[in-house]
Structures are given as C-alpha cells and as structure tokens.
C-alpha cells in the first residue's frame, strides 16, 4: 500500500476551515479544481454520503464520505471503484485532519491518503496526490466569497 501526505501550517483558526471542509456536499464552493459536484441520493453530511465530482482530469468520480468527526476535526473519504477513475490508484482513502495550535489562531492542515497502485507507479501517483493536496489546502485556506 502506498501513501501520500501534505502538512501545512495556516494562520487561521480551525473552526472556519472545518465549516468548509465538513460540508462534504459543497466542496465545489472552495475547491477550484472541481467544476461540477452533485450529491447522489441519500445522506449528504454523514458517512455514506456520495458525491459525483467532475474536474478537468476526472469527469465523473464518485467520492464517498467514510467518517466525519467535528470533535477531532477529522474527515475521511474515498473513491468508489466504479466508474473507473482515470488515476491508476485503487482502494483510495484520504483523511484530512485539522490540528489547532494552542498559542494562536492557527491550524496544521494534514491531508493524507493510502491507496494501492501497480509497482513502479508509486512515485508518479504520489507526486500527483502531493501536488493536489497542496492545491486543496491553498483553496481551503484562501479567503472565501461572502
């Protein structure tokens, strides 16, 4: 199993970041890469929620919310095996954890994933996910429109 991870310190308290992150149905509101996102029938903010996401590289990715914990500021989601994802990774599960600093209004954003891939693809896929997580964290922490 391969893994990718990005941790970044941001000068923002965890609460507003968590409000954006925990709203699984509205990541398109802050994530520049996502041009289209709609929720599948069923729950929208609890485990089992499924969104169908479109982005320039993956026009129809089905992402499933596995866990959400407001107390620990932790959220886990994954990509459903069907339809086929254009990224050659399988059993993809990502976790985003916000770690509040105690001495000032700042947060460590820890975005990580574990996945299976073919031998020899680990570096290429790892670099892709690291670049995406950097982009996601920048989008998450950028000023939001009113």
Model-derived regions, located:
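A generic beta-sheet turn/junction motif
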Residues: 10, 56, 102-104
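Intrinsic-disorder/low-complexity, polar/charged segments enriched in Ser/Thr/Lys/Arg/Asp/Glu/Gln
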Residues: 2-7, 50, 60, 74, ...
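Beta-strand/loop substructures that line and gate deep hydrophobic ligand-binding cavities in soluble
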Residues: 82-138
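Glycine-rich portal/gate segments that line the openings of hydrophobic small-molecule binding cavities
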Residues: 29, 38-87, 143-146
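Hydrophobic ligand-binding cavity/cleft-lining segments
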Residues: 1-43
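Hydrophobic/aromatic beta-strand elements that line small-molecule binding cavities or substrate pockets
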Residues: 6-8, 61-67, 91-101
């Amino acid at each position: 199993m391969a893994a990718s991870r990005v941790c970044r310190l941001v000068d923002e308290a965890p609460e507003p970041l968590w409000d954006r992150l925990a709203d699984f149905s509205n990541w398109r509101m802050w994530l520049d890469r996502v041009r289209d996102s709609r929720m599948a029938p069923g729950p929208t903010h609890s485990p089992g929620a499924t969104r169908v996401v479109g982005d320039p590289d993956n026009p129809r990715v089905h992402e499933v919310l596995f866990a959400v914990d407001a107390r620990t500021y932790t959220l886990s989601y994954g990509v459903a095996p069907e339809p086929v994802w254009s990224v050659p990774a399988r059993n993809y599960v990502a976790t985003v954890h916000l770690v509040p600093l105690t001495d000032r209004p700042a947060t460590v954003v820890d975005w990580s994933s574990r996945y299976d891939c073919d031998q020899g693809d680990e570096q290429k896929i790892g670099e892709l996910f690291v670049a995406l997580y950097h982009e996601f964290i920048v989008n998450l922490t950028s000023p939001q429109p009113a």
